[in-house]
Design a protein with these regions (language model features):
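Glycine-rich, proline-tolerant flexible connector loops at the mouths of alpha/beta enzymes
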Residues: 52-87, 180-187
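Alpha-helix-loop-beta-strand connector modules within alpha/beta enzyme cores
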Residues: 70-93, 97, 103-106, 195-206
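Conserved small/polar residues in nucleotide/adenosyl-binding loops
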Residues: 347-349
Length: 349
């Protein structure tokens, strides 16, 4: 059976690679932590809206940070999010009290992220999932910590699945997270995640989920690693990808994969997203070709529009990123012009 998640206004059927927006999470984000402590709900809602516009289908919601009353803030954030976005939510916390406060005010069917292989955690959180009708994420980790081998993680996952089924949670609403370890620190264990994921998919018959971006932490050019790892995981059977929906490389991989695996019927979603898009290199080449045909040298077009007169030094400084020079040029111009006059003149260049 398909797994369906819903909000008061929309629903998501997990029938292909489904994107879970990762940005509502204070981990490693000082500005987000500050927003939580100060109750700056506008900042948090901006993160939700931007992810929705970028193509996220579900939003992960994590409000755990030092100095934050997590249960109270979880309730507040869940209420606020439902007023501005229509996406289903994934309530992300290791505290049962925070999860229940969020579940109590959520109108729809969310995901609870997460339980793990510890008996105490299973007995505390699984009844909440059953009570509120939520899907559940099970982490392949227990009292011993993260195990390096695929076999050990699979055995923990099996224990979590058995416990969830025993609590009356349908198999289609169980998502297993085999845990993404950073390639910079545990390179030798990267493939174990993919192998364990594949076994959970085929042998346990459950859905799978991963925090994809964790793979590249501490390494340069992170989108390259994220996109490659995402593709590996999708081929192994990934269902939910917790990722940054603003990453065009990763989103392109998701949409393309759903086409090539016949999950996006008639390529409808892919066409809707990309039909009107032209690759940047092709667009630039066409623009230069059109200018050349009209008698304008390509080099002149590539260099941008020429600016002469008193504003030329300022424009050049801005284009080159010379802050000190730009400030000096601006100061000189302000000796002769009013601020508004200067701004309006630059706008019309």
């Amino acid at each position: 059976m398909p797994s369906v998640l819903c909000s008061p206004m929309d629903f998501v059927t997990v029938d292909g690679i489904t994107v879970v927006g990762e940005r509502i999470n204070p981990t490693g984000k000082k500005r987000f932590q500050q927003a939580l402590r100060e109750g700056d709900m506008n900042y948090i809602l901006e993160q939700a809206v931007s992810q929705s516009e970028a193509g996220a289908q579900v939003l992960d919601v994590n409000v755990g940070a030092p100095g934050v009353d997590e249960p109270a803030v979880m309730e507040q954030v869940v209420k606020a999010l439902q007023s501005v976005v229509s996406l289903p939510l994934q309530l992300d916390s290791s505290h049962a009290d925070a999860l229940e406060r969020g579940l109590r005010v959520y109108n729809g069917k969310p995901i609870v992220n997460s339980v793990n292989g510890e008996t105490e955690v299973l007995e505390r959180v699984l009844p909440l999932c059953k009570k509120y009708g939520a899907a559940v994420v099970g982490l392949a980790i227990d009292e011993r910590g993260i195990q390096p081998s695929a076999d050990a993680r699979f055995e923990i996952a099996k224990r979590v699945v058995d416990a969830a089924l025993a609590h009356g949670i349908p198999r289609e609403d169980i998502y297993i997270d085999c845990l993404t370890l950073t390639a910079s620190a545990q390179q030798q264990d990267v493939l174990a995640t993919v192998e364990a994921l594949a076994r959970c998919k085929t042998e346990l018959g459950v859905r799978t989920i991963l925090g994809v971006s964790n793979i590249s932490f501490g390494l340069p050019c992170r989108p390259y690693l994220n996109t490659t790892f995402l593709t590996m995981a999708m081929y192994a059977g990934l269902d939910l990808a917790i990722m940054n929906p603003s990453s065009e490389e990763m989103m392109a991989a998701v949409y393309a994969y759903n086409v090539l695996t016949n999950r996006d019927k008639q390529s409808g979603r892919y066409i809707a997203r990309y039909a009107d898009r032209v690759p940047a290199s092709a667009a630039l080449a066409k623009a230069l070709q059109d200018k050349a045909a009209s008698g304008v040298p390509a080099a002149a077009e590539a260099a941008g529009p020429a600016v002469s007169g008193p504003y030329a030094p300022l424009m050049k400084a801005v284009e080159q990123g010379l802050k000190g020079e730009a400030a000096a040029c601006t100061k000189a111009l302000l000796a002769e012009k009013e601020p508004l006059e200067l701004v309006l003149s630059l706008i019309h260049i």
